[in-house]
Amino acid sequence: MQGEASRLADRESRDSFAAKLRESGNDAWEIGNELFTITYVFDHNPRIPRALTDPGRPTEDKVALLNNLLGKQALPLTMEILTDLVGRSWSRAGDIDNAIEDFAVDAMMYQADDEKKTLKVSVQLAQLQSALLNLPVVRSDLSDSQGPLNVRYELLHALIDGADFDRITVRLAEHCTRNPRNRRYLESVQWLINKFSRHMGESMVTVTTATPLSDEQSDKLARIYTKKTGRPVHIHSVVDPTVMGGMRIQVGDEVTDNTVVAQLENLKRKVKAGVSE
């Protein structure tokens, strides 16, 4: 959890660059990729963020270190963002890595805005999340930062290559397995969905049922969750015959599972607990 100084530094820096990122056009894609790579490098070389957040070190020295590390390899706006970040105060060194990752996602969202694909990417992330719900071994392997990266990449692409996902969705999905950052894979995907929802000003409601929702059901759920969340919602319908009946509804981290299969599993647990007493 970030301290107050880090939360303030992260928020103020991102707010100050929002307009520039929004207006960066196709550069946002490259900026996002550069910042994801830098997050990875900093996470795996903790001495770098420690040096860049050292309160006893002059900002000019930190900027000089940045220039030595990156030279002219990064785009000017990427360097401008990093220069701003190292000039701020941080509660702990690793928090600057979190801010760089936040900026990377922001850049990808602005790229999606520029291509008018923001909702599409958000829905595809929800589709990826839904596809992984019944694949616990795959989820575990994608989260295993100790395993070979190429194996995780191959596993991910075996799962998504036939889905015709947008390049932004693919890049975000790759980041989640390349650099898990102490998060489980599904946790990372949900974190991204939440970010896209806030960015769009609406909530993503994923509804899993055994058969497709009718228009009436979808409209009713939209009304209920618009009132509940206080903002517009997008209903993402997932058909999974294995749930047998009922609905599984996820909004952010909140899950309400009233499917038949969930009730049967709950009944099994109760029976097992009763037998063992």
UniProtKB/Swiss-Prot annotation:
Pfam families: OSCP. Keywords: ATP synthesis, Cell membrane, CF(1), Hydrogen ion transport, Ion transport, Membrane, Transport. GO terms for molecular function: proton-transporting ATP synthase activity, rotational mechanism. One of its GO terms (cellular component) is proton-transporting ATP synthase complex. InterPro entries: ATPase_OSCP/d_CS, ATPase_OSCP/dsu. The keyword Ion transport applies. It is found in: Cell membrane. It is a peripheral membrane protein. The keyword Ion transport applies. Belongs to the ATPase delta chain family. F-type ATPases have 2 components, F(1) - the catalytic core - and F(0) - the membrane proton channel. F(1) has five subunits: alpha(3), beta(3), gamma(1), delta(1), epsilon(1). F(0) has three main subunits: a(1), b(2) and c(10-14). The alpha and beta chains form an alternating ring which encloses part of the gamma chain. F(1) is attached to F(0) by a central stalk formed by the gamma and epsilon chains, while a peripheral stalk is formed by the delta and b chains. This is ATP synthase subunit delta. It comes from Bifidobacterium animalis subsp. lactis (strain AD011). The gene is atpH.
